[in-house]
Amino acid sequence: MSGKIMAINAGSSSLKFQLFSMLNEQTGQHHEQVLCQGLIERIGMDDAIFNLRVGDVQWRETLPIADCRQGAEHLLRALIEHNVIDSLDEIIGVGHRVAHGGETFADSVLITPQVLDKIEQLGTLAPLHNPVNALGIRVFQLALPHASAVAVFDTAFHQTLSQTSFLYPLPWRYYEELGIRRYGFHGTSHKYVSAVCAERMGQPLAALRIVSCHLGNGSSICAIGHGKSVNTSMGFTPQAGVMMGTRSGDIDPSILPFIQQTEGKSAVEINHLINNQSGLLGISGISHDYRDVEQAADNGNRRAALALELFAERIRAVIGSYIVQLGGIDALIFTGGIGENSRSARQQICRELTFLGIELDQEKNIRNQFFIQQDTAPVQIAIVNTNEELMIARDVLRVALNLPVQPALATQ
């Protein structure tokens, strides 16, 4: 068995991919090696961009790619042309990131016609993502009919939330008839980093109380107890929760009809306002990018500094509430683009949490060590590089091929 597995994230105009070798062909033993990774951008345009990286070598070309099918065909040809594989038959499994599994999917699943139909039906909950995810599945099933296909849902990890954590206090029929509830997102990332952290701590994940902070242009916090998601900050949509790059996060809902009536905005315009014009961008007036706002704050821009403090304060408030819900905390995780790379963001968030045992070591934080808490601190603070693609590949092994997977530590 070749053991090559592809992880796919299909977007409306993009296709992100990684190819892994998950089994040693000589010994049959489990191992994890990235063979290549890449991204197709501007699908549907005459100047689409195809990026492929194999080890330290990178190729980039501009060409017309009309749709996802053409993109997939070009990608698979490139794998052979650049000697990544000798034959498409070597790819034994494909894992697809799917945005929304609703209440139907509490785990990754082997894709059947019935599963694919349900993914498309759940497009009512994720109209921008599920339909294109489903299209990507169909395209790769045609291109690689021999390969097992597995759907990995962003929402699945959070299906362990209790009713008191996922219900909104609205009339019951809105949950029963329309499925309005907290679903949460970034589940694959939170699941991966919590497993890595537990492995590095040398303790079983089931014994730990963890708060995971996935901080990027989209940000979410997750309370993890006994290895399961107990609560998460994103809700019915990824708009909910903490302040983000361009999203407001949680606000008083009555603000929205007030703005509608005062400024005569439509529902579409209001949705654009809270999703695309708010957050760091809205408060700073500069950028949605944390690095740009941070630089402006360093140069004396008061609104930029305020945006950073508001960002940290909203996150601290959620961390505190989750510690209460978990009955304590053993580890605080930072992941995502901001969480992994911004030492100042980590410092600002942890600064007011020392009374909870969250005591940051400044030198370790500056050096981006894995554990950055003070030596005597009761709570571990970890920087964990997320790897959703690897988690997807592992789920293909587990779900489709019924093979055991390595501890998460293998890639950290």
UniProtKB/Swiss-Prot annotation:
Family stated for the protein in its record: Belongs to the acetokinase family. PduW subfamily.
Enzyme class per UniProt: transferase
Cellular component GO terms held in the UniProt record: cytoplasm
EC numbers for this chain: 2.7.2.15
Name of the featured protein: Propionate kinase
A GO BP annotation: propanediol catabolic process
Keywords: ATP-binding, Cytoplasm, Kinase, Nucleotide-binding, Transferase
Catalytic activity: propanoate + ATP = propanoyl phosphate + ADP
Function in brief: Works with phosphate acetyltransferase (pta) to capture exogenous propionate and regenerate propionyl-CoA during degradation of 1,2-propanediol (1,2-PD).
Subcellular location: Cytoplasm
Pathway the protein takes part in: Polyol metabolism; 1,2-propanediol degradation
GO molecular function, one term: ATP binding
Source organism superkingdom: Bacteria
